[in-house]
Amino acid sequence: MGTEGKAGSKLLFLFTSMILGSLVQGKGSVYSPQTAVQVPENDSVKLPCIYSGFSSPRVEWKFVQGSTTALVCYNNQITVPYADRVTFSSSGITFSSVTRKDNGEYTCMVSEDGGQNYGEVSIHLTVLVPPSKPTVSIPSSVTIGNRAVLTCSEHDGSPPSEYSWFKDGVPMLTADAKKTRAFINSSYTIDPKSGDLVFDPVSAFDSGEYYCEAQNGYGTAMRSEAVRMEAVELNVGGIVAAVLVTLILLGLLIFGIWFAYSRGYFERTKKGTAPGKKVIYSQPSARSEGEFKQTSSFLV
């Protein structure tokens, strides 16, 4: 008998033992021959759930993805959000078409109407989606001796992609980088899960053209655009020149204020303004002293 025949016989023996044990003990059992299922996106798939020892089974299916929980099946009936693409049977549920949003854990829960008998089994569903072209963040120039972080990411691949980096077309090792002659003078680390490439510190040998690759074991590995990064020396001369120019300008400003003060410019400005005095203008009277003019007459 071949290996496949032995495995099939063993599975049949375990299933038969489970059924007989449940009948003897009067306790229900729930079982699935597949606790991890992988299927390409848009294909159909069945999640099997086999149970025994229940006189009146009540079946529910729960879906968990991160912090999100939803009921796919309640009391042997598919719920409304899944009714158009999921069917229920006594041996499991079948998706007519799956998307990457269906990734997660499905739990088949079987109980009696009275609630005294209960069993469950969980199945992890992975919807296979090839990675998309990753995007990178690579600085055009970095200062030698500083820390530099290059990032690579893509968000379509399922399962999540792992990342690798290349410099001038040469693969960068994720461990023991100095074993490669091209990187013997470089100090870097690569996190294949997050896609981060970290130089700490940057050396003059780190100048070059960098790109990354994303792959998840399904479909073709995808490559990012290549971007050149230059490792440059700290411009000490430029910093000194900037400080000197600033000091010269500050000195000229102080000299200008002193010169204006010594020439009395500020004193003349104070005298010219005389802020405490007010000038009042009045309209001349129509009659001045020594003159008499009849302005009106009255007749009685």
From Swiss-Prot:
GO terms for biological process: actomyosin structure organization; cell adhesion; cell differentiation; cell-cell adhesion; cellular response to mechanical stimulus; epithelial cell differentiation; establishment of endothelial intestinal barrier; intestinal absorption. The keyword Ligase does not apply. GO terms for cellular component: bicellular tight junction; cell-cell junction; plasma membrane; protein-containing complex; slit diaphragm; tight junction. Residues 260-300 are cytoplasmic. The modification Phosphoserine is found at residues 282, 285, 288. It comes from the Eukaryota. Keywords: Cell junction, Cell membrane, Disulfide bond, Glycoprotein, Immunoglobulin domain, Membrane, Phosphoprotein, Repeat, Signal, Tight junction, Transmembrane, Transmembrane helix. It is found in: Cell junction, Tight junction; Cell membrane. Residues 1-26 form the signal peptide. GO terms for molecular function: integrin binding; PDZ domain binding; protein homodimerization activity. It is a single-pass type I membrane protein. Residues 28-122, 134-228 form the Ig-like V-type domain. Belongs to the immunoglobulin superfamily. Seems to play a role in epithelial tight junction formation. Appears early in primordial forms of cell junctions and recruits PARD3. The association of the PARD6-PARD3 complex may prevent the interaction of PARD3 with JAM1, thereby preventing tight junction assembly. Plays a role in regulating monocyte transmigration involved in integrity of epithelial barrier. Ligand for integrin alpha-L/beta-2 involved in memory T-cell and neutrophil transmigration. Interacts with the ninth PDZ domain of MPDZ. Interacts with the first PDZ domain of PARD3. The association between PARD3 and PARD6B probably disrupts this interaction. Interacts with ITGAL (via I-domain). Interacts with CD151. This is Junctional adhesion molecule A. It comes from Rattus norvegicus.
